[in-house]
Amino acid sequence: MKTVQFLSNSIHIKNIIKGLTLSKSLFVSILIVGEPYTGKKTLVKSLFNENRFINGEDSKEVTKALESLKEVIIYNFEAIENIENLNFENKRVIAIANRVQNNHIIDRKFAFIYKMPPLRERREDLPLLIEHFINEIRDELMIKENIKPLISPEKIDLTHNIKSLRAYIYKKLILSNLSKDDIEEILYEYLYKNLKGNNAYRENIQLFEKPLIEAGLKKYKSQLRLSSILGINRNTLRKKINELNIN
């Protein structure tokens, strides 16, 4: 069985791991609740036998597991109805849920309840996860060069936690690996689809001008230097910056 590793520098996560580790020798019921794609299931997999995982959407399997096993891990726990009828006695039960209702029943059923914080509250985890996904996706895409995509912290998509972070890194790696021919092909496809009207040149030339100037300003930190690099007058550059609403 493949070893599952959970990457985190978060004190909150380390405390959850500590609590779960201490419970390995105890017959107790534990609930881990948090937003989707925060790593709840991966965290539990890194500590417990994956063969004990039961989908809460399958009520028959849940009942069967609770009747026959001493250790049961139930994911999609929020899908279970009539939680109060579940028998957790003399068992180690770990439930994983995206949300919970009936808090008074939950409080009675579980000895320990851990809240998994979303990634936006675990910024200290981002460098680890970004490096991990860069290496993983580079292998997946068979990118041989040691490419380091430009990551802007303020632009990282955490709306769906780890899922959207990975998608963001995937996109950045693809963009970082594009050749001149690739870029020309992308522009060709876009322009073929969208070219219309009677002022198309002026409307579409910013597809080239805006990223050119934005990248230059970020790289050279100076309008004067950039105007020299581009071979245009500084006033012309300033005018373009205003026209293109570049901050």
Give short role names for the model-derived ranges.
Residues I16, I32, T38, Y75, ...:
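Conserved RecA-like P-loop NTPase ATPase core
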Residues M1-T21, F27, I156, N194-I205:
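Dynamic helix-loop-helix/coil hinge segments at AAA+ ATPase domain boundaries and subdomain interfaces
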Residues G34, I54-N85:
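Conserved P-loop NTPase "ATPase switch" module shared by AAA+ and STAND
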